[in-house]
A protein has these predicted regions:
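Generic structural hydrophobic/aromatic packing signal, biased to beta-strands
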Residues: 8, 20, 35-37, 60-63, ...
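N-terminal secretory signal peptides
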Residues: 1-46, 50
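C-terminal partner/receptor-binding element of secreted or periplasmic proteins
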Residues: 73-124
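Alpha-helix initiation/capping motif
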Residues: 21, 54, 108-109
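A short, surface-exposed interaction/processing loop segment used at functional sites
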Residues: 53, 57-84
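Generic detector of leucine side chains in alpha-helical contexts
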Residues: 5-8, 25, 37, 62, ...
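Alpha-helical structural elements
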Residues: 4, 30, 58, 67, ...
Length: 124
């Protein structure tokens, strides 16, 4: 539901709007933070993906892509990829550094991540 979408500020130059589905957020026993990412383009198109970020190795993984608003299709490229700080995939770097795995700090719990996303502010 739209009420569960938490806005994610990516950059002042981003042309799309980014959201994390708060109900999808989880931290697994393997330490991977899993979440549903919703990207809305300026023209109204929406992309939905189920992803994970592994703090220990600074990597991300795309598990599945949403299709037709009701089904998931498994990603064809489900290999772990190093998180790069570039304009194309900046949302992953923001989630990694500012919300899920802040450098030099204790890893936040799920409640803290959700609170920070709700506030629209990083945890520092």
């Amino acid at each position: 539901a739209s009420a569960d979408l938490l806005p994610l500020y990516v950059s002042s130059t981003a042309t799309a709007s980014f959201f994390i589905d708060g109900k999808s957020l989880s931290i697994a026993d393997d330490g991977v933070v899993r979440y549903t990412l919703v990207i809305r383009g300026s023209g109204g198109a929406e992309n939905v993906s189920y992803e994970g970020i592994r703090c220990e190795t600074a990597e991300r993984k795309l598990y599945a892509i949403g299709r037709n608003g009701s089904e998931w299709v498994r990603s064809r490229n489900d290999a772990w990829q190093v998180i790069a700080e570039n304009a194309l995939n900046r949302q992953h770097a923001v989630l990694f550094k500012e919300y899920f795995c802040p450098p030099g700090e204790v890893r936040p719990g799920l409640d803290q991540i959700v609170r920070s996303l709700r506030r629209g502010a990083v945890m520092r």
